Structure formats: C-alpha cells, structure tokens
Curated annotation (Swiss-Prot):
The keyword Membrane applies. It is a multi-pass membrane protein. GO terms for cellular component: extracellular region; membrane; monolayer-surrounded lipid storage body. The keyword Hydrolase does not apply. It holds the Pfam family Oleosin. It comes from Arachis hypogaea. It is found in: Lipid droplet; Membrane. This is Oleosin Ara h 11.0101. InterPro entries: Oleosin. The lineage of its organism: Eukaryota, Viridiplantae, Streptophyta, Embryophyta, Tracheophyta. Belongs to the oleosin family. May have a structural role to stabilize the lipid body during desiccation of the seed by preventing coalescence of the oil. Probably interacts with both lipid and phospholipid moieties of lipid bodies. May also provide recognition signals for specific lipase anchorage in lipolysis during seedling growth. GO terms for biological process: lipid storage; post-embryonic development; reproductive structure development; sexual reproduction.
Amino acid sequence: MAEALYYGGRQRQEQPRSTQLVKATTAVVAGGSLLILAGLVLAGTVIGLTTITPLFVIFSPVLVPAVITVALLGLGFLASGGFGVAAITVLTWIYRYVTGKHPPGANQLDTARHKLMGKAREIKDFGQQQTSGAQAS
C-alpha cells in the first residue's frame, strides 16, 4: 500500500509499487519503440543516399545550375515581396501622419523638423549678418 513519508515538514504519499512498475514499463516500451524507429529511419536514409548518389553525380551538370537558378529566383521574389511590404508600411505611415492620426514616431519626426528649422534660421541669420557686415566695410 501507500506509505506516508514526511518531507520538509509536509506529509507526502508515495505511489504504490504497481503504479511505479506500470510507469517504468510504459517508459521502456515507448523509449524502445522510438529507438527502433530511429534506427529504421537511419537505415532507410543510408540506403536512399547510396542509391541516389550516383544519379546526383550523373545529373549534377544539370541539377547544380537549376538549383542555383531556382534559389536566385526564390530569393528575388522573397526580396521583392519584402520591399513591397515595407513600401506599403511606409506609405500607410505617411498617410496617417499627413491626415493627423499621429502614428508611432510622429513626435520624434516633429522634434527633428523643429530642430532643423531652428538651425536653418540660425544659419540664415548668420549669413545675412556676414553679408551686411561685408557690404558695410
């Protein structure tokens, strides 16, 4: 039967031996089945590679350029799709900014715009002072 053990001041029930035996048996059966399945997959992979390798060697002058072409086409489509999504995102952000819906980052853009306008005004004033001082002398 189950025995009561005291662990850390608390009572803990230990499982009966039959339950432990069932758990151990289930674990061994499941683990063994998976191990056998892994061995069969490994054997199938080795046999498949052994039979397919000569075909790869014979057809490699055709397969290598074809694989390179397909890879480049796939990367091109992936890049163009990514650029398209980025463009749509940027255009959506600009639309929200122009219509006054205040998209994320609009405060930073406004701050940068005001700083640039202030610096441009300072440079303009400095240039006017320099030209008026040069004309007076």
